[in-house]
């Protein structure tokens, strides 16, 4: 029986890494073959000295699919240990058991499973089949549910707790606020219609840094 959120989340992180990193490795090998062996996995055409070579059939979008199939679970590979540490620190410094511990554990299981079917929300403007966008928008909104559950449970753990505002606790509170802001911006970017005009803007940069950059570092 795992009674530590940190231990539970680190374990699930290893499972995610086990399934996510092979996609990155395969895409790197295929790209190496394109460069050295003149295969055509990702490159649709090749021009040398102004002449089109007999070279075709590759798809740059295939590389994006492989990269983001790794890339989105990798966000949680980075964030899950932070989730577990924050849960344990909040419980300790609020002098309360973590609210809904079993739900927190199952929320991480749900996040881990869903993280493998949301990758193409990074690719709404890449040229992929637009009908796929609506499927991935739906799964992206669904993954927000267990993520929000963790935030609610952190807040409910603090509710009426004997809170000690030590330095670790202040960092945890900063994590919650930062991650909450990052998650709310993600709701906009997960929607196909809203994401298209926001692509390549600082809105995306802010979302990335609040979720992936600042929050886990805190």
Regions found by a protein language model. Give the residues of each.
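Transmembrane-helix bundle segments that line or gate the permeation/cavity pathway
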Residues: 1, 16-38, 84
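Single conserved hydrophobic/aromatic residue that forms the stacking wall/gate
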Residues: 1-7, 11
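Hydrophobic transmembrane-helix microenvironments that flank and shape a buried ionizable site
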Residues: 6, 69-71, 147-150, 206, ...
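Short helix-boundary/re-entrant hairpin motifs in multi-pass inner-membrane proteins
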Residues: 9-19, 26, 56-120, 149, ...
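Membrane-interface interhelical loops and short amphipathic "cap" helices
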Residues: 28-70, 93-98, 117-137, 161, ...
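Hydrophobic cores of alpha-helical transmembrane segments in multi-pass inner/ER membrane proteins
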Residues: 76-84, 140-153, 211-218
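Loop-to-transmembrane helix boundary motifs in multi-pass membrane proteins
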Residues: 100-110, 162-183
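Long, K/E/R/D-enriched contiguous segments that form extended
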Residues: 122-177
